[in-house]
């Protein structure tokens, strides 16, 4: 779980859920501590403290008005709720697999360099069971998948440890097993989503590794639609 959500507990997350149900995921909504306290079966002071903690954790934004507080759930707050949702799916459905979709795009070539480094390649062979093709398949996620991606935090990744050589240190990375499916229905099952701890990519960009060059194996070009079924 991310550092942000570790700063709040179950009480704050239940409060976050209530304001999200009021519409705070889509924009600012007016919330009064008295009304929130009634719904939480708590005192006004307790409701106020929970909102303050959510704001301090950057899970909500608040503006004070004469009618109460105008509250919006932030992107970090939405990710926290997505993680809660994934946990409940695991509890009641037995798994929390995540399906993402987007379009293939060209990267900047950094993946080829880093994946080929011996400190990473050795761990890929040991922990993933294969030697990846030197390069990543880059996917620009659609808007819905950007929001859904947070559910991956509930999946246990394969950890690739950081390491160092005589020149610099290299950060850790996390890998999740993935099955890829093209718009034509072709599937590829020996792949992993990889997320370096140090990255300039945003949540809308996904990197995938596999033992083969996926563009050739799946006949993919820039702009082609791809579904990614992520598991653990």
Swiss-Prot record:
According to its UniProt record, in which pathway does this protein act? Answer: Cofactor biosynthesis; FMN biosynthesis; FMN from riboflavin (CTP route): step 1/1
Q: Name one GO molecular function term.
A: riboflavin kinase activity
So which cofactors does this thing need? Mg(2+)
Q: Where are the stretches annotated Riboflavin kinase?
A: 98-232
Keyword Magnesium part of the UniProt annotation = yes
Where in this protein does the record put region H-T-H motif-like?
1-97
Which protein are we looking at?
A: Riboflavin kinase
Q: Which gene encodes it?
A: ribK
């Amino acid at each position: 779980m991310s550092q942000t959500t570790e700063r709040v507990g179950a009480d704050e997350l239940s409060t976050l859920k209530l304001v999200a149900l009021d519409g705070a995921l889509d924009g600012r909504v007016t919330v009064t501590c008295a009304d929130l306290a009634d719904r939480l079966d708590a005192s006004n002071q307790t409701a106020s403290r929970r909102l303050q903690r959510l704001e301090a954790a950057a899970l909500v934004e608040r503006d004070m008005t004469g009618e109460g507080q105008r509250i919006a759930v932030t992107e970090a707050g939405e990710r926290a709720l997505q993680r809660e949702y994934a946990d409940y799916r695991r509890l009641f459905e037995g798994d929390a697999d995540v399906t993402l979709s987007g379009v293939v795009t060209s990267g900047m070539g950094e993946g080829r360099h880093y994946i080929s480094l011996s400190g990473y390649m050795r761990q890929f062979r040991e922990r993933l069971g294969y030697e990846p093709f030197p390069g990543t398949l880059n996917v620009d996620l659609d808007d819905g998948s950007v929001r859904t991606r947070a559910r991956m935090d509930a999946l246990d990744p394969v950890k690739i440890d950081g390491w160092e050589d005589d020149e610099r240190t290299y950060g850790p990375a996390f890998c999740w097993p993935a099955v890829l499916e093209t718009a034509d229905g072709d599937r590829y099952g020996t792949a992993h989503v990889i997320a370096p701890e140090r990255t300039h990519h945003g949540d809308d960009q996904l990197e995938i590794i596999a033992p083969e060059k996926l563009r050739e194996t799946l006949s993919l070009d820039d702009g082609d639609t791809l579904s990614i079924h992520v598991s653990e």
